[in-house]
Design a protein with these regions (language model features):
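Basic amphipathic alpha-helical segments that dock to polyanions
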Residues: 9, 26, 37-47, 168, ...
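A short, conserved structural fragment
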Residues: 45-55
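Basic, amphipathic "hinge/linker" alpha-helix immediately C-terminal to the N-terminal HTH DNA-binding motif
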Residues: 56-75
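Mid-protein regulatory/catalytic core that forms ligand/cofactor-binding pockets
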Residues: 102-209
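Key DNA-contact positions within bacterial/archaeal DNA-binding proteins
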Residues: 35, 91
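Residues within the helices of the helix-turn-helix
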Residues: 23-24, 42, 62, 80
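N-terminal helix-turn-helix DNA-binding core of bacterial DNA-binding proteins
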Residues: 1-32
Length: 218
């Protein structure tokens, strides 16, 4: 088994978890055939990296989660490095980091971490796991469920959808920006927020991907 494939599977399961991940869901996430996923899960189970129940899905074991978080750490450090040193846009970072993350040695990982002064979050606002895989507790919520008339600060935006990221960037809806929830459509779940002195309508699908926390005085 190629280590790149193993790392991709483990990282994808971590992203889709923590509950059991269905074979079909994992196949869609990785853009591979369900039969290929089933075979790989069986092999990962034999290696003690996943707990796999046929027809019910799979979840990471403690060993599998540690390996997954190692890849997540590399990926998010690389995104941060590429943004700070090469000034790549947020919509470019994910794909470039995907290509590089499997080739990053532990020594280079430490060097990048030191060079960046041990960053806590990547440019999308996602927490960067520590060297032992430790993650801070999440204290943010999806924008779609944020209370009306309550100020908030955007903490995270999605990293996989370049089109969505491009739109968020164009509207200034990025980590660190301050907003206030103004209205929520009771039918389609879309929201209206006040951002930079203007009203912005955000589709439900986007509002569920953007995460916010308390803060701001908009």
């Amino acid at each position: 088994m190629a280590s790149v494939a193993v790392e991709n599977y483990l990282k994808s399961m971590w992203e889709l978890g923590p509950a059991d991940v269905a074979t079909q869901e994992l196949a869609q996430h990785l853009a591979v055939a369900p039969a290929s996923v089933t075979r790989m899960l069986q092999r990962l189970s034999e290696r003690g990296l996943v707990a796999h129940t046929p027809y019910r899905g799979a979840s990471l074991t403690a060993a599998g989660e540690r390996k997954a978080l190692t890849v997540v750490r590399r990926h998010r450090l690389l995104e941060t490095f590429l943004a700070r040193t090469l000034d790549l846009g947020r919509d470019q970072l994910h794909d470039e980091a995907e290509r590089l993350e499997h080739a990053l040695s532990p020594a280079l990982e430490r060097a990048i971490d030191d060079y960046l002064d041990n960053p806590q979050r990547d440019p999308h606002g996602h927490p960067i796991p520590g060297p032992q895989g430790e993650l801070p507790p999440e204290g943010d919520s999806p924008l779609g469920g944020w209370p009306l008339d309550r100020p908030a600060t955007v903490s995270q935006v999605p990293d996989r959808d370049a089109g969505m990221l491009g739109w968020l960037e164009s509207q200034g809806l990025v980590p660190g920006c301050e907003l206030r929830m103004v209205a929520r459509d009771p039918f389609d779940g879309g929201v209206t927020v006040k951002l930079d002195g203007r009203l912005l309508q955000v589709a439900a699908s986007v509002a569920e991907e953007v995460r916010v926390s308390d803060g701001g005085a908009v």
